[in-house]
C-alpha cells in the first residue's frame, strides 16, 4: 500500500512544477504543452481500454453487466461533474495575462482552482486504486496524471502571480489543486485498506477506466488542440500509446507487475 500512495503523492506534486514555471516566467511553448496533454491522453486511453477494463472483467466472480456497468458509470459520472463544475480552460487564463484586469483574472483563476481540485480528487483515488491492483499500470497512470498536472499548475499560478505580484500566493493557489489529488489518494488508502475484496477492487477499476477515457476525450485532447491549433494532438496521443504499450510489454517480459 505504501508504493501506490507514494505514486499518488508524486503525481499530485507535479502541479508544483507547473506553478514554479508560472511564477518564474519560463512558460513552455504551446506546442510542448499540447504534445504533453496528447501524450497523457494516449497513456490513459491505452491503459484504460487495453489493461484496466479487461483486467476488471477477467476478475473471478465479476459479471460483464457489473463490469461494463461500472465503466459506464465512470464515464457518465465524469461528464456529469464536468458539466456541473465551474469550467475554464488553462489556455484561456494564460491568454488573459495580457489584459489589464487583474481582479477578474484572479477570480477566474480561483474558480479554475476549485474546479480542478474537485476534478483532481477522483484522479488521486484512481491513481491509488490502479497502483494497488497492478503496480505497472499504476506507474503509467501516475505518469499521465503528472504530465497533465504540470500545465494545470502553470495555468493557475501564472495569472494569480500576474494579478497579485506574489509568488507565494500563486504557488499556494496552484498547489491546492495538487493537494486535492493527494487527499484523494490518502482517503483511498485509509478507506480501501479494509475493502480489499477482488470484486470491489475490480468494480472500482472499471469505473476508473471510464473516468480516464472520458477525461482523455473530453478534456485533454480538445485542450491540446485549443492550445496549439496549428499542430495535430494525435501525434502526442499516438506517441503516448506507443511508448506506454512498449513499456508494458517490456515490464511483462521481465516479470514486473
Swiss-Prot record:
Reactions performed catalytically: Zn(2+)(in) = Zn(2+)(out)
UniProt keyword list: Cell inner membrane, Cell membrane, Ion transport, Iron, Membrane, Metal-binding, Transmembrane, Transmembrane helix, Transport, Zinc, Zinc transport
Origin: domain of life: Bacteria
Binding residues annotated for Zn(2+), in chain numbering: 123, 148, 152
Protein's cellular compartments: Cell inner membrane
One of the record's GO cellular component terms: plasma membrane
Stretches that traverse the bilayer: 5-25, 32-52, 61-81, 109-129, 137-157, 171-191, 195-215, 236-256
Keyword Iron: yes
Bilayer topology: Multi-pass membrane protein
InterPro entries the UniProt entry points to: ZIP, Zn_transptr_ZupT
Residues holding Fe(2+): 120, 123, 149, 152, 181
GO MF annotation terms: metal ion binding; zinc ion transmembrane transporter activity
Its job: Mediates zinc uptake. May also transport other divalent cations.
PANTHER family: ZINC TRANSPORTER ZUPT, ZINC/IRON TRANSPORTER
Sequence similarity: Belongs to the ZIP transporter (TC 2.A.5) family. ZupT subfamily.
UniProt-recorded name of the protein: Zinc transporter ZupT
